[in-house]
Amino acid sequence: ADAKPYTYYLELAATAADEFMKSSGYALYTAETPATNYVNLFNKHSVVEGTNKEIILARNYDIQYGVVHSANASYQSATLGRPGLTRKLVASYLMKDGSRFTDKAGWQTMTFVEETKDRDPRLAQSIRTPGYCRLNTTTPVAPNLGYTVTGYAPIKYFTGVEDDTYQTSYNDLPLFRTAEVY
């Protein structure tokens, strides 16, 4: 076979990505603030309408047609899998200044509060960190270790309390975003 070197495919991918960024009409979502942009890509009932030009492909859910899921119920239950991010994944989030968290002295033994301090804002939009509030509320909610096997409770796809019952979540689930092209 005439196998091509990996650089050939990397160059093809770079060319396609450049063309996509210049001419697709898609763009990174910046409608709000750095403290909310990332999480709001995943917790809106419709992510493909309005000012959001980042989502390329999403699984559409619609309560009107009974097309629902149970993301909220799964995140609020000790019996529905207890999802949680791994410590290795959490450690991979950068610091707010762009430096690596794992370059900090003593990072392996830091408390949860210490390890989530001064991190890239997307960490606090991926897991419950100190000061986390549910969507459309102002009351801080601490992580419930009974709901997550790792201690790092995910909040992606997590909407308001009105969707907490089993099979009542209907926010769209992004599958492919412009950020993956960048």
Model-derived segments and spans:
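An aromatic- and glycine-enriched ligand-binding surface/loop that stacks and positions planar moieties
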Residues: A1-L145
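Conserved, well-structured interaction surfaces
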Residues: F112, K117, T129, C133, ...
